[in-house]
């Protein structure tokens, strides 16, 4: 068995095995345990009572967190005409059509979100092999294919998170940064859980939100007592 590092021993000494933590206490403990020199993300994993092998139980959506994620989000938009002007005014980092597609094919993919108006999908459709593997392909299910590109840009910049159940029925997303006020982190997670409940598949039976785990980029995962959340 590999030996634990000093940092791992210090972390292990402060975590109670099998405990479900009050959310605010968990956020405070994760901040205390963060010793890295960069601003770690605070992430949440939510185990859902779904069978992701069934297409009608794949949970996929997007929601704007009330306090954002603390990340700077670069947004590219495929559109033209007045919509292009509106997207730029809303804060898009790059707007274009065939010219933008050519840049992306050449390897310029320094974007976190790609948005497209429906009329631009003839161009975006050529980029499936480029954008798909990076999770950047616009999709109407998460609001990135829309006639209202300006609003989509505002949402992305405001801290919208996009999520989808993995093969184990778990969704993973960032909900802030270490150093965020614990109450703001809590409200972000509550907004996410409320959105998950809103789109609960009708065919999902039994307990829907089974487990919520909070962690940092380099830190441990703490199971959250769902009774400490208002969602």
Swiss-Prot record:
Gene3D superfamilies: 3.30.190.20, 3.40.50.790. Keywords: Repressor, Ribonucleoprotein, Ribosomal protein, RNA-binding, rRNA-binding, Translation regulation, tRNA-binding. The keyword Transcription does not apply. One of its GO terms (cellular component) is cytosolic large ribosomal subunit. The keyword Ribosomal protein applies. It comes from the Bacteria. GO terms for biological process: regulation of translation; translation. GO terms for molecular function: rRNA binding; structural constituent of ribosome; tRNA binding. Belongs to the universal ribosomal protein uL1 family. Part of the 50S ribosomal subunit. Binds directly to 23S rRNA. The L1 stalk is quite mobile in the ribosome, and is involved in E site tRNA release. Protein L1 is also a translational repressor protein, it controls the translation of the L11 operon by binding to its mRNA. This is Large ribosomal subunit protein uL1. The lineage of its organism: Bacteria, Pseudomonadati, Pseudomonadota, Gammaproteobacteria, Pseudomonadales.
